[in-house]
UniProtKB/Swiss-Prot annotation:
Similarity remark: Belongs to the thaumatin family.
Cysteines paired by S-S bonds: C35-C224, C76-C86, C91-C97, C139-C213, C144-C197, C152-C162, C166-C175, C176-C184
Glycosylation sites: N188
Name under which the protein is recorded: Pathogenesis-related thaumatin-like protein 3.8
Pfam families listed in its UniProt record: Thaumatin (PF00314)
Organism (species): Cryptomeria japonica (Japanese cedar)
Keyword GTP-binding: no
InterPro entries, per the entry: Osmotin/thaumatin-like_sf, Thaumatin, Thaumatin_CS
Length: 225
């Protein structure tokens, strides 16, 4: 029969393992605004926060959170209750987002599996420059630092942003759906985004733009890196 002291040690060890799993499963994101203008940061999960130049918003993802996305909104106006509108990235007229943002918006995407997977995505278009910076120095820090709006074709341009061809035209060729679901090459439109931001997803099948890092890594997301 196990002694009381042995049982106590087993209990302490079990608690330590449980705490370790919880700690390594939780992830912290520091969202920083380095733009020369106000950005209303958004996250699913997380909600939203107004960030003036130099401000940081911290989002702690609970252990077991499988995916998240973050983006910046511009040209926003909210009342005291948190209701309003944004020129780009609007999420149903709410300061604290519970739904995805309207296109176009530059996205930081995160998925947790056997390790962390993350990417900067222009699949929904572009509104502001963005980077993802892991705390693990061995991991890649992808960024889209260029002002894609400056080279946006007229047919993709909207106030404050540049739509992707998929968002603008909604065709199988540009969205990699239907007959293009299994074989979907880059297009002249996606190459505009890729040439400006080589590390970012430029269209739905641009899988070379996914990066991986060991689980337990924290991240900072920087607007206007």
């Amino acid at each position: 029969m196990a002694k009381v002291s042995d049982l106590a040690l087993l209990l302490v060890a079990g608690m330590a393992i449980s705490l370790y799993i919880q700690e390594t499963g939780a992830v912290k994101f520091d969202i920083k605004n380095q733009c020369g203008y106000t950005v209303w940061a958004a996250g699913l999960p997380g909600g939203g926060q107004q960030l003036t130049q130099g401000q940081t918003w911290t989002v702690n993802l609970a252990a077991g959170t499988q995916s998240a996305r973050f983006w910046g909104r511009t040209g926003c106006s909210f009342d005291a209750s948190g209701k309003g509108t944004c020129q780009t990235g609007d999420c149903g007229g709410q300061l604290s987002c519970t739904v995805s943002g309207a296109v176009p918006a530059t996205l930081a995407e995160y998925t947790q599996s056997d390790q962390d997977y993350y990417d900067v995505s222009l699949v929904d278009g572009f509104n502001i420059p963005l980077s993802i910076n892991p705390t693990n120095a061995q991991c890649t820090a992808p960024a889209c630092k260029a002002d894609v709006n400056a080279v946006c074709p007229a047919e993709l341009k909207v106030d404050g942003g540049c739509k992707s061809a998929c968002a603008a035209f909604q065709t199988d060729q540009y969205c990699c759906t239907g007959t293009y679901a299994n074989s979907c090459p880059a297009t002249n439109y996606s190459m505009i985004f890729k040439n400006q931001c080589p590390q970012a997803y430029s269209y739905p099948k641009d899988d070379t733009a996914t990066f991986a890092c060991p689980s337990g890594t924290d991240y900072s997301i920087v607007f206007c890196p």
